[in-house]
């Protein structure tokens, strides 16, 4: 009787441990969301975030928006919310222009960060303060093409970090349409 009780206790403890550890971690792969077609790039948009096409400021594009730029706001309902919510702003160089990594000296308190590796890219970058807001700037190259990501880490009452599963899922989900 005692050994049966001990065996049941061990099995129950093992099952509890499996469920506890299965729920741990900040895996980008476990984030739910959908793909947004930005034109020349596709991006992953987690639930609770909303994506917007880049503005065609000079009327250069047939689409009526910049197909190389996407902004994704956490908790955003409209494009105006991008001014008071944490956001990720993605810019792709396109095939006929070149982007370069913005200098951290342009910002206050610029500090290099460790590279962030996703399945398709290795992102290098830094954190800094821009107009009083904590930001991160990331950059990667894919042959002759580049992608720059600017992350507003705090805005309004909300904060995000580069370690958040949502942010990692966004970085993982940036795909250049070939």
Feature locations, PLM:
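Short glycine-aromatic motifs
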Residues: 28-33, 49-50, 107-113, 121-123, ...
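A structural detector for beta-sheet-dominated domains
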Residues: 37, 44-46, 52-54, 73, ...
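Surface-exposed amphipathic alpha-helical segments
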Residues: 49, 147-178
């Amino acid at each position: 009787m005692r050994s049966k009780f001990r065996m049941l206790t061990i099995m129950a403890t093992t099952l509890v441990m499996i469920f506890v550890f299965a729920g741990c971690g900040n895996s980008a792969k476990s984030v739910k969301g959908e793909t947004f077609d930005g034109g020349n790039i596709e991006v992953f948009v987690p639930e609770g975030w909303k994506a917007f096409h880049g503005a065609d400021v000079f009327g250069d594009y047939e689409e009526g928006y910049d197909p190389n730029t996407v902004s994704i706001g956490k908790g955003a309902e409209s494009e105006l919310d991008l001014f008071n919510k944490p956001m990720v702003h993605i810019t792709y160089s396109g095939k006929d222009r070149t982007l370069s990594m913005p200098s951290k000296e342009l910002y206050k308190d610029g500090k290099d960060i460790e590279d962030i590796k996703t399945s398709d890219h290795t992102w290098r970058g830094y954190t800094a303060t821009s107009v009083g807001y904590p930001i991160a700037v990331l950059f990667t190259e894919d042959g002759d093409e580049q992608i720059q990501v600017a992350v507003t880490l705090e805005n309004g009452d909300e904060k995000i970090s580069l370690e958040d599963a949502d942010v990692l899922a966004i970085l993982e989900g940036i795909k250049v349409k070939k």
